[in-house]
Every structure is written in structure tokens, then in C-alpha cells.
Design a protein with these regions (language model features):
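Extracellular/surface recognition and adhesion modules
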Residues: 1, 26, 34, 50, ...
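Extracellular acidic loop/turn motifs
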Residues: 4-10, 105-111, 206-211
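Contiguous beta-strand segments of beta-sheet-rich domains
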Residues: 11-15, 29-57, 111-116, 131-157, ...
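Surface-exposed, proline-enriched loop/turn segments that connect beta strands in immunoglobulin-like
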Residues: 16-18, 84-88, 118-119, 184-188
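Short strand-edge motifs at loop-to-beta-strand transitions and within beta-strands
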Residues: 19-21, 28-34, 70, 120-122, ...
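Terminal edge beta-strands and adjacent linker/stalk segments
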Residues: 53-80, 153-180
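Short, solvent-exposed loop/linker segments at the N-terminal edge
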Residues: 89-95, 189-195
């Protein structure tokens, strides 16, 4: 803080950030040191503005604080925030797979929308670090099931300095639930002598490989 004339008595200057500066008698300047905003993962304003809220002392005839703010530009250090995907490790046929997207710090500004390879999206709300989506595992009558895989294809939103997606695939194994398949036989209701009878074998579920009926 700087005076245009030397102080007759100590001057106490109160700043808008809560700090105070003392200008000693006979002096025209005084200083105080404060910490710059701490590094974080969010986009910062880029500058710090402080004004004088009040000044007392000095024995001046008329002490008038300037309303012009003191401005300090703050260089933002870019930190990366990564969104990761996890999933249930196993599920039964017809069961529900839960996908969870996680980011390292609470979301600010706007929700983060995570797009998955299976076409679903997960929303991580403001103030949250996780969001979920569910999918149903297919249920069929065939033996064996391929694992269900999924991954993040993109992320948007939030107020992060650098938001990126961990696109490592996640996999969920599917446990067989035995389903009964019935094979039935039907025939032509009637036929003339010397004609042909048609026999039809019918499955209640589609065959995964050719079925020979004896």
C-alpha cells in the first residue's frame, strides 16, 4: 500500500482478502505477503483482484483510499483428471451388469457425461465423483457365453483443466443358467394311399449348431 504523503502516525490498511498492511509513521509504503491460490484440477479465474476496504491512522487531514483494485495474474498449472470405468466381474445370464465411471475430484460447473462403447452414457453429477449405468446380460439356451466387454469412448463437461478418458476395456464373465429346450415331433394329419407323410421336428429354442433327430 502506498501513500502520497508520509504517515504522521502508523496507518492500518484493511484489504478485501482479509489481510492488513501497516504503514509506519514517516513512511509512505507498507507490504503484506499472502499465498497465491493453491494448485487444483479445475479451471481457475486466471487473476486475483484485491481492493482496499478501509484505512485508519496517519494523522492526515483527509485520508482517501483508492477504489482501484490491485490485480495479479496467476498462471494456471494444467493438471489432468482421468475418468475410469469399472464393471461387475461376473453376472448370470439375464442378470444386470453395473458400470461405474469414476473421476478423481468432485465435478464442478456442469455434469460430466461419459459415453460407452455399447452406446450407453453415464452422468457424473456436480459435486459427485462417480456415476453408474446398468445393462442386462443376454439369456439364451446355448452352452457357454462370451464375456461382455465395454469401454469409455469419450467424456465431456465439468470444469476440469484437462479431462481425459481411460479407454481400457472392462470385461464381465457371464455364467450359464441352464435352460430346458424341448424337441417335439409332428406329422401330416392325413395322407392318401401312396402319398408322403411329412414329419416336422420343432425346438423351443433356436439351435446353435445343426441338430440331427433320429
Amino acid at each position: 500500500a502506498t501513500l502520497t504523503n508520509p504517515a504522521g502516525t502508523p496507518v492500518t490498511v484493511t484489504l478485501s482478502n482479509g489481510a492488513t498492511i501497516t504503514i509506519d509513521a514517516g513512511k509512505t509504503t507498507g507490504t503484506v505477503t499472502v499465498d497465491a491460490p493453491k494448485d487444483d484440477v479445475y479451471k481457475d479465474a486466471g487473476k486475483v483482484e484485491v481492493t482496499i476496504e478501509g484505512a485508519t491512522g496517519g494523522n492526515f487531514e483527509n485520508l482517501v483510499p483508492s477504489a482501484v483494485p490491485a490485480v495479479t495474474n496467476v498462471t494456471d498449472t494444467i493438471d489432468t483428471s482421468t475418468v475410469k470405468l469399472s464393471a461387475d466381474t461376473s453376472v448370470a445370464e439375464g442378470g444386470t451388469v453395473t458400470y461405474t465411471a469414476t473421476v478423481g475430484a468432485p465435478v464442478t460447473g456442469s455434469p460430466v457425461v461419459v459415453t460407452l462403447a455399447n452406446g450407453q452414457t453415464i452422468t457424473i453429477g456436480v459435486g459427485q465423483t462417480t456415476g453408474t449405468a446398468t445393462a442386462v446380460a443376454a439369456n439364451d439356451a446355448l452352452t457357454g457365453n462370451a464375456p461382455i466387454t465395454n469401454s469409455i469412448t469419450g467424456v465431456t463437461g465439468g470444469n476440469f483443466e484437462d479431462l481425459v478418458a481411460d479407454k481400457t476395456p472392462v470385461s464381465t464373465s457371464v455364467t450359464d443358467v441352464p435352460d430346458t429346450t424341448t424337441l417335439s415331433l409332428s406329422a401330416s394329419n392325413s395322407v392318401a394311399e401312396g402319398g408322403q407323410i411329412t414329419y416336422t421336428a420343432t425346438l423351443t429354442n433356436a439351435a446353435g449348431s445343426p441338430v440331427t433327430v433320429t
